[in-house]
């Protein structure tokens, strides 16, 4: 019974792993942390417990923390080798180039605040809108002092406000999502301007997300409970027709970060609503996606774009008018250039990578089709690593979060199973001994009955069968 339960739970975990395979892809990052050695940080370097010495020993925790940091050289040679993996093993090999698409996609936003007096009616990047929301949280004291003391800041807003996300391969999206309005984007290079809106299984999407993405104007009143801080013209439902066809705008570096000749600095592009958008490329929502039943989708709710849009941003960054800010960052001593946010008055350091000026990927996410495929891909990378040691620059460290998480869970289940099997075995031994004792006592106490049976012609074999039957029934 215990083995059956253990086997059943292992099968359940395997099914869970299959369902969540796309949520935790195999990843290779330019820089990463080796979580597998996390438990070693506070392991003692002293061999003997409770030493009889008048000394305090210092652990090398900082050195171990530094040792957990891994750098990968995602060279052209390795990328060529990685692309030799059989395409039938994975849905998509997604490249992240280290820039935020939210800084390049613009929308009209309308916010009207009574306390303090604030009227925002601008054409700006989605990322700038997120910064405004973070500022509002600061102004209304949304972070309790006890949480602030623990290091919690308004940056958590970004993790709760899904904005722009890149979709992996079309095949994976078609397997996990239904198109409930409009069409599925083509994923072709020339159709980089196609976006989709992703809703949850209830057709829900956050009202804050709608505000950030500029679907409808909002009224924001500082000091009200957070649940009442935003109101959208009394509209609780929006038809598919109003959403499909919504326009957004793609900026290149020259449009996103114009140079201010007066202040001699680059700045975020913020214009009045209805401003000239001829310097921008038009994007359009072509469909609405909803996850299929019993499927853990790879996308969060919000807007999603195809890899073709990423390729388009990298392509435009190579044009002469867009290279100025990239060259300024490349030629600076710090490797970055300050960009002024006129609304907050603060500057942000932008590097070559965050300006979409580096065509080398910062992270690679591989969405395997199944476990056999994932293991084959890992074996392919291991074959590359076999030529090097972990200290070599060419050695590639990859992360398999799902394997680590379920591996720990499987170890725990195995440990519980071993304990239960041990208890069961002990119970079985004790029961066998007790049955033997009962049988022995039964034979000793029933000698007269045995004598009667023998006198009636019963053989020893017949009498043994009687007692064996009783023992079997007792057992």
Regions flagged by a language model, labelled:
Residues 2-27, 31, 35:
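Alpha-helical transmembrane segments
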Residues 267-290:
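Short beta-strand-centered aromatic/proline hotspots
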Residues 419-430, 439-440, 448-475:
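Transmembrane alpha-helical interface segments in multi-pass membrane proteins
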Residues 37-247, 251-254, 258-264, 280-282, ...:
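Short beta-strand boundary microenvironments
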Residues 4, 8, 433-438, 467:
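Transmembrane alpha-helix boundary/anchor motif
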Residues 5, 9-13, 46-47, 154-160, ...:
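Peri-transmembrane interface segments
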Residues 32, 201-203, 254-255, 290-293, ...:
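Helix-start (N-cap) segments at beta->loop->alpha junctions
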């Amino acid at each position: 019974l215990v083995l059956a339960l253990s086997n059943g739970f292992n099968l359940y975990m395997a099914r869970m792993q299959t369902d969540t395979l796309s949520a935790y892809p195999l990843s290779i990052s330019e820089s990463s942390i080796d979580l597998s050695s996390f438990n070693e940080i506070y392991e003692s370097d002293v061999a003997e417990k409770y030493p009889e010495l008048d000394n305090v020993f210092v652990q090398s925790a900082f050195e171990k923390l530094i040792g957990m940091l891994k750098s990968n050289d995602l060279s052209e040679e390795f990328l060529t080798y990685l692309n030799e993996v059989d395409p039938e093993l994975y849905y998509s090999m997604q490249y992240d180039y280290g820039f935020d698409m939210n800084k390049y996609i613009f929308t009209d936003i309308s916010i009207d605040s009574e306390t303090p007096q604030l009227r925002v009616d601008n054409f700006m990047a989605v990322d700038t809108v997120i910064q405004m929301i973070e500022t509002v949280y600061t102004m209304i004291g949304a972070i309790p002092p006890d949480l602030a003391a623990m290091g919690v800041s308004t940056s958590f807003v970004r993790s709760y406000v899904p904005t722009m996300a890149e979709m992996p391969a079309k095949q994976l999206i078609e397997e996990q999502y239904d198109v409930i309005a409009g069409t599925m984007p083509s994923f072709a290079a020339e159709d980089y301007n196609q976006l989709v809106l992703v809703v949850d299984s209830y057709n829900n999407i956050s009202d804050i997300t709608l505000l950030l993405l500029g679907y409808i104007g909002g009224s924001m009143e500082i000091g009200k409970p957070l649940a009442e801080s935003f109101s959208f013209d009394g509209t609780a439902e929006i038809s598919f027709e109003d959403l499909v066809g919504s326009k957004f705008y793609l900026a290149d570096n020259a449009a996103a970060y114009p140079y201010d000749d007066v202040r001699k600095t680059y700045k975020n592009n913020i214009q009045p609503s209805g401003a000239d958008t001829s310097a921008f490329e038009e994007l359009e929502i072509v469909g609405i996606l909803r996850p299929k039943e019993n499927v853990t989708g790879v996308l969060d709710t919000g807007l999603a774009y195809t890899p073709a849009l990423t390729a388009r941003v990298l392509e435009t960054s190579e044009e002469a008018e867009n290279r100025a800010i990239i060259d300024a960052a490349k030629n600076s001593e710090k490797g970055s250039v300050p960009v002024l946010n006129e609304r907050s008055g603060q500057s942000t350091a932008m590097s070559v990578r965050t300006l979409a000026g580096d065509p080398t990927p910062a992270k690679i996410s591989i969405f395997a089709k199944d476990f056999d495929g994932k293991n084959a891909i890992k074996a392919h990378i291991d074959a590359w690593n076999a030529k090097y040691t972990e200290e070599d620059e060419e050695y590639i460290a990859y992360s398999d979060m799902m394997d680590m998480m379920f591996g720990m869970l499987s170890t725990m289940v195995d440990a519980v199973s071993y304990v239960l099997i041990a208890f069961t075995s002990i119970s079985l031994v004790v029961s066998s001994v007790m049955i033997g004792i009962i049988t022995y006592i039964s034979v000793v106490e029933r000698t007269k009955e045995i004598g009667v049976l023998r006198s009636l012609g019963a053989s020893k074999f017949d009498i043994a069968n009687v007692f064996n039957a009783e023992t079997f029934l007792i057992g």
